[in-house]
Amino acid sequence: MKWIAKKRLQSVLGLSVVDGQLRVAHVARAKSAIAVVRSASAKLSLDLLHPEAELVGREIKNHLEAAGIRERNCVIALPPSWIMTQHAKLPELSAEDQASLLQIEAEKGFPVDPDELQIARSPHRSSESAYVTQLAVRRDQLTRLSTVLKAAGLKPE
């Protein structure tokens, strides 16, 4: 059986929205380096979580067109206000028990049910103990963001 290899992108659009300010940078491979092809910044009149995702997507698309940016493959930095964090000390436990402990910590530490969150974990050690940092974002926000990006004609990677 022959596997189809995913082609490496030669360029990508990076986006961030913080406090209603859209910032974009189109970057591309240039020999042995990465170069910024074009960048732009614009104030959004609509919030990313506006009920009509198509309108938000259209506004982003209009800003990209005005800046002369045609790249559609993108990555996006999540708005910092969407990210919840939690830091926990991990006792010596089996992997299964650690997963259960982190689930309990998430239930106690985050303001919503962990089933409504996308949680990423980053383990780290000090000389004395093991710790984990849990980062969480509401799934409904991620779904809305995906809908907005698709409405803007973008392809999140």
Specify the residue positions occupied by each region the protein language model found.
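Hydrophobic/aromatic-enriched cytosolic interaction surfaces used to assemble or bind macromolecules
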Residues: 1-157
